[in-house]
């Protein structure tokens, strides 16, 4: 894993669709407020995504760490005040103790909000996994990441894409020696459809449960290069213990 790759994924993910298409490959603009757990991490600008897991905690990717973060909830168009947003500063930001910035193993981070959010139809938590998602499970990935294959176009409106969990064998074959037990691949081995990572730290939700966190990958929609995500089902104990201790 190169440092260049890691840097490329922070803030807005790399997008390299096979087709000359200025949209996330296979993706679409999410119906307004259909992803109420999606958050935007902001430090004067949107730089990563995350997921609300209860009224005072957000989960994201550890490689999205900044010492000061404002969490923005209830967003759809992140460049317009629409009246449903809640902006809350982070009180605590906790990276997994075994996170590796080189291999991106254990790429998970918890953010405690300085005050609880007001839960409603447009701001609501997503459930943690009760079990790991088997290969073939269909998932929803969302984010405000770059939508251009050449250049930069960060969309105003939240983007969604549907993609399946791949087998661990296929994931390891796609990235020999780079996949750990804390990573899963989601996407299509044949290429042509992908989330283009959406946004680093953002959610992969399967059957109503948070199964993945946008972590890394090589390009987008390239054959044999699916997106790689933090395997959230392996971290439920750590999440629960960390919340209880803080």
UniProtKB/Swiss-Prot annotation:
Ca(2+) binds at residues 75, 77, 80, 85. Its EC number is 3.4.21.4. GO terms for molecular function: metal ion binding; serine-type endopeptidase activity. Its main location: secreted. GO terms for biological process: digestion; proteolysis; response to acetaldehyde; response to caffeine; response to nicotine; response to nutrient. Residues 1-15 form the signal peptide. It is found in: Secreted, Extracellular space. SUPFAM superfamilies: Trypsin-like serine proteases (SSF50494). The record marks 194 as: Required for specificity. Keywords: Calcium, Digestion, Disulfide bond, Hydrolase, Metal-binding, Protease, Secreted, Serine protease, Signal, Zymogen. It comes from the Eukaryota. Its cofactor is Ca(2+). Disulfide bonds join 30-160, 48-64, 132-233, 139-206, 171-185, 196-220. Pfam families: Trypsin (PF00089). The keyword Secreted applies. Transmembrane segments: none annotated. It catalyses: Preferential cleavage: Arg-|-Xaa, Lys-|-Xaa. Residues 24-244 form the Peptidase S1 domain. The active site is at 63 (charge relay system), 107 (charge relay system), 200 (charge relay system). Residues 16-23 form a propeptide. Binds 1 Ca(2+) ion per subunit. GO terms for cellular component: extracellular space. Interacts with SERPINA1. This sequence represents the precursor of the major form of trypsin produced by the adult pancreas. Belongs to the peptidase S1 family. This is Serine protease 1.
């Amino acid at each position: 894993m190169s440092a260049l790759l890691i840097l490329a994924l922070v803030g807005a993910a790399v997008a390299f669709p096979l087709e000359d298409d200025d949209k996330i490959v296979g993706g679409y603009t999410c119906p307004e407020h259909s992803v109420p757990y999606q958050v935007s991490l902001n430090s004067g600008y949107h730089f990563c995504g995350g997921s609300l897991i209860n009224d005072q905690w957000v989960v994201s990717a550890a490689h999205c760490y900044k010492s000061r973060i404002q969490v923005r909830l209830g967003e759809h168009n992140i460049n317009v005040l629409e009246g449903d947003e809640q902006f809350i500063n982070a009180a605590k930001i906790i990276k997994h103790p075994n996170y590796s910035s080189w291999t991106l193993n254990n790429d998970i981070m918890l953010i405690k909000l300085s005050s609880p959010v007001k839960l409603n139809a447009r701001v609501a938590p997503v459930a943690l996994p009760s079990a790991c998602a088997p290969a073939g499970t269909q998932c929803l990935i969302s984010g405000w990441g770059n939508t251009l294959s050449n250049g930069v176009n960060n969309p105003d409106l939240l983007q969604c894409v549907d993609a399946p969990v791949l087998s661990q064998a296929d994931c390891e074959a796609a990235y020999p020696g780079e996949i750990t037990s804390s990573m899963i691949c989601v996407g299509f081995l044949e290429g042509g459809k992908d989330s283009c990572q959406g946004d680093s730290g953002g959610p992969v939700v399967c059957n109503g449960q948070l199964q993945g966190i946008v972590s890394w990958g090589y390009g987008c929609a390239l054959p044999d290069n699916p997106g790689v995500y933090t395997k959230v089902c392996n971290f439920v104990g750590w999440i629960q213990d960390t919340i209880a201790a803080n």
